[in-house]
Amino acid sequence: MFNFAKTAVLMAAITALFIVVGGMLGGEQGMLMALLMAVGMNFFSYWFSDTMVLKMTNAQQVDERSAPQFYALVRELSEKAGLPMPKVFLIDEDAPNAFATGRNPDNASVAATIGVLKILSNRELRGVMAHELAHVRHRDILISAVAATMAGAISALANFAMFFGGRDSEGRPNNPIASLMVAILAPIAASLIQMSISRAREYEADRGGAEISSDPEALAHALEKIHNYAQGTPFQAVEQHPETAQMMILNPLTAGGLAQLFSTHPPTEERVARLMHMAKNGEYPGAN
């Protein structure tokens, strides 16, 4: 119920922002058109955003024949978590990362890059995929899918406002400065909405992953490795579609310093510290 409420709040907030941008582009008619588009896009997001995200990241589906060890690992963790077997995908990217998508546990997919399989031990990979399956179990993946789709739409509308301007409710051209401000501020606002929910969601998935794998230390080590390797290895598909970055186990586009304040993910060092504390004190479900 809590995750359903989070989804509703996120969809309502981003829909409202979408309508406001539409109003600045075309007055009352623009708001009405934006509202109709938002309803359609939310419907589309619910049913098809997982397919879009997998296509954006160039993910290729695998099975027990094409990727036997990885597929078996996901199946073992799924059974332990009490979840239906998700579809399994690999992404031909050296950047180490992973994500989950799909509207519910019965229609879920998990994906990992070739890079993450190369750098992690089997124990660490179990921790990562357990984290992703925790997202599935918590039904967080719908939030990520809707956020990615709507954030991309808001950015597109904002860019349209910057280059083509818009009209007010009386049909007069908008102030170009106002259009520029919309182009700058609307995507930032969309990111802040995502950030307010995503950080807590990642902590929950870390804890849930520790429960599924019974090994928070392995996930902590995996996060450290992914963080260190990702610094010099660009995730090309995510750079082309930055709206998908917030779905990854670590945001590949996050910078340090002040930019960390606007990240959809908590600081890696904080996540690692929490997991190591859980491992040391046995403060996680499934601990002996």
Curated annotation (Swiss-Prot):
Q: Could you give the cofactor binding note from the entry?
A: Binds 1 zinc ion per subunit.
**UniProt-listed Pfam families:** Peptidase_M48
Q: Which InterPro entries is this protein grouped with?
A: HtpX_protease, Pept_M48_protease_HtpX, Peptidase_M48
Catalytic machinery residues: 132
- Record keywords: Methyltransferase included? no
Task: Give GO MF terms, alphabetically.
Answer: metalloendopeptidase activity; zinc ion binding
Keywords per UniProt: Cell inner membrane, Cell membrane, Hydrolase, Membrane, Metal-binding, Metalloprotease, Protease, Transmembrane, Transmembrane helix, Zinc
Q: What is its EC number?
A: 3.4.24.-
GO terms under biological process: proteolysis
- CC cofactor: Zn(2+)
Any transmembrane segments, and where? Answer: 7-27, 29-49, 141-161, 177-197
Q: Which domain of life is it from?
A: Bacteria
Q: Which residues form a coiled coil?
A: none
Which residues are recorded as binding Zn(2+)?
131, 135, 202
Q: Where in the cell is it found?
A: Cell inner membrane
Q: Name one GO cellular component term.
A: plasma membrane
Q: Which HAMAP family match?
A: Pept_M48_protease_HtpX (MF_00188)
Sequence similarity? Belongs to the peptidase M48B family.
Can you say what this protein is called? Protease HtpX homolog
Gene for this chain: htpX
